[in-house]
């Protein structure tokens, strides 16, 4: 059995994620209260405005303990939370270029440096290979705080490499989508990633391997029009906003007010766009069970 050592403690793949130390996250033990205290930094829930300690919200997988609102997770934190054990990170050799010498209110390279400084990531997609409930798989997650999780050439490169590795090692690929769409600063090159990622997904299907998409808040544009809607199974987190054009753009076009829950996960479930809505606390076991069924694993 594979084991990993963190903070001087030996952990097996079956160790509950609440007992593991996630890089960059201070994990609370079960005795710690989920209520805010005066001695710890707090986060205000955007839904119920409750103040929750950073320790408590991390312990609760970034779900508000007061109202159950699903807060946004950073890509790296999500993948480390998702896997029992991370074996490798993929795609770090890819780095963004500026072939168009694109300048809007500031040069593209400057925007990239700002995004890297803000998130600590080199690009908007993080890819890891690991095990979940003793099943090896590959998972990728979009970092929405990196230029809105936009898809450029490096995101395409990393996704395609993840799919190719999954085919090579006969493993499932999981994608946690959270994106505003294609990256305008790369023009047609970013739009080409829609075709590249779609072709990579088709190769996975030809190989008989599962591709599962978890739609988190929000998913829009070219990512929705490609890799986010080509899964064998589509899972959404509660209340996630999912669409192609944004709600305001549609309202301005059709000159009508679109009432809630338009474009919410619940609306899409009612209209057959997603297969199920899964609470974040049940997500790991749900994905593990689906992968095991689709791959005929015990």
Swiss-Prot record:
Its main location: cytoplasm. One of its GO terms (cellular component) is acetate CoA-transferase complex. InterPro entries: AcCoA_carboxyl_beta, Acetyl_CoA_COase_Trfase_b_su, ClpP/crotonase-like_dom_sf, COA_CT_N. Its cofactor is Zn(2+). SUPFAM superfamilies: ClpP/crotonase (SSF52096). Pathway: Lipid metabolism; malonyl-CoA biosynthesis; malonyl-CoA from acetyl-CoA: step 1/1. It catalyses: N(6)-carboxybiotinyl-L-lysyl-[protein] + acetyl-CoA = N(6)-biotinyl-L-lysyl-[protein] + malonyl-CoA. Belongs to the AccD/PCCB family. This is Acetyl-coenzyme A carboxylase carboxyl transferase subunit beta. It comes from Acinetobacter baylyi (strain ATCC 33305 / BD413 / ADP1). The lineage of its organism: Bacteria, Pseudomonadati, Pseudomonadota, Gammaproteobacteria, Moraxellales. The gene is accD.
């Amino acid at each position: 059995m594979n084991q990993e050592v963190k903070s001087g403690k030996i952990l097996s793949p079956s160790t509950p994620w609440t007992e593991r130390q996630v890089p960059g996250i201070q994990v609370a033990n079960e005795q710690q209260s989920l209520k805010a205290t005066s001695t710890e930094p707090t986060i205000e829930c955007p839904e119920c405005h409750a103040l929750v300690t950073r320790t408590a919200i991390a312990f609760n997988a970034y779900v508000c303990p007061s109202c159950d609102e699903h807060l946004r997770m950073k890509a790296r934190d999500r993948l480390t939370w998702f896997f029992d054990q991370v074996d490798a990170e993929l795609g770090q050799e890819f780095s963004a270029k500026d072939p168009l010498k694109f300048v809007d209110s500031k040069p593209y390279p400057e925007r990239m440096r700002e995004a890297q400084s803000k998130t600590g990531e080199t690009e908007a997609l993080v890819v890891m290979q690991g095990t979940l409930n003793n099943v090896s798989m590959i998972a990728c997650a979009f970092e929405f705080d990196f230029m809105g999780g936009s898809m450029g050439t490096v995101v395409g490169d990393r996704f395609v490499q993840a799919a190719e590795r999954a085919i090579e090692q006969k493993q499932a690929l999981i994608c946690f989508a959270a994106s505003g769409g294609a990256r305008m600063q790369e023009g047609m090159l970013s739009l080409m990633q829609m075709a590249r990622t779609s072709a990579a997904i088709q190769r996975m299907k030809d190989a008989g391997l599962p591709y599962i998409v978890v739609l988190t808040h929000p998913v829009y544009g070219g990512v929705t029009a490609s890799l986010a809607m080509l899964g064998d199974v589509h899972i959404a987190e509660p209340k996630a906003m999912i669409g192609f054009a944004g709600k305001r753009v549609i309202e301005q076009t059709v000159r009508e007010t679109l009432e809630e829950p338009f474009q919410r996960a619940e609306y899409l479930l009612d209209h057959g766009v997603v297969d199920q809505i899964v609470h974040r606390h049940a997500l790991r076991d749900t994905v593990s069970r689906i992968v095991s069924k689709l791959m005929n694993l015990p």
